[in-house]
């Protein structure tokens, strides 16, 4: 179904593990293929003194490349994360937001009408609600 929806260029939003499944594979499940919808690898967040893994909590986003999900948001909005693995996208142009947690994390990507967020917009207060409204508008909704 995911391949069909993305092939038809219908707006599609993946969150957290859903984002990770869109790529080639993951350190979390070595030898298990991802869906290959987008190019990139899912890597374990590097251990760094003073940082806990899993990464649970609020981090600011660095917005880039004019992501449609982030239209109308202030610079460096805070969103909520819960993860131990992160995306390293093969194509930097699809990366629409990054955050820092031991390394640069590709926190959101957009390719055509496929959107994905490592963070949880549904747990990210008014910023998350704005992101979800922007996605609804892409589907013709009156968010």
Q: PLM features: residue spans?
A:
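Amide-donor transfer/coupling interface in amidating biosynthetic enzymes
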Residues: 4-7, 41-143
């Amino acid at each position: 179904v995911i391949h069909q929806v993305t092939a038809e260029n219908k707006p599609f939003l993946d969150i957290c593990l859903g984002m990770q499944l869109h790529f080639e594979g993951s350190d979390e499940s070595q030898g298990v293929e991802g869906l290959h919808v987008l190019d990139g690898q899912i890597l374990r967040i590097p251990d760094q003194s003073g940082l806990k893994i899993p990464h649970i909590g609020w981090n600011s986003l660095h917005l880039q490349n004019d992501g449609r999900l982030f239209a109308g948001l202030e610079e460096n909005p805070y969103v909520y994360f819960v993860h131990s693995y992160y995306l390293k996208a093969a194509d930097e142009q699809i990366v629409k937001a990054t955050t820092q947690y031991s390394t640069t994390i590709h926190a959101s990507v957009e390719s055509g009408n496929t959107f994905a967020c490592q963070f949880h917009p549904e747990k990210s207060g008014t910023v998350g609600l704005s992101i979800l409204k922007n996605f609804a508008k892409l589907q013709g909704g009156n968010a």
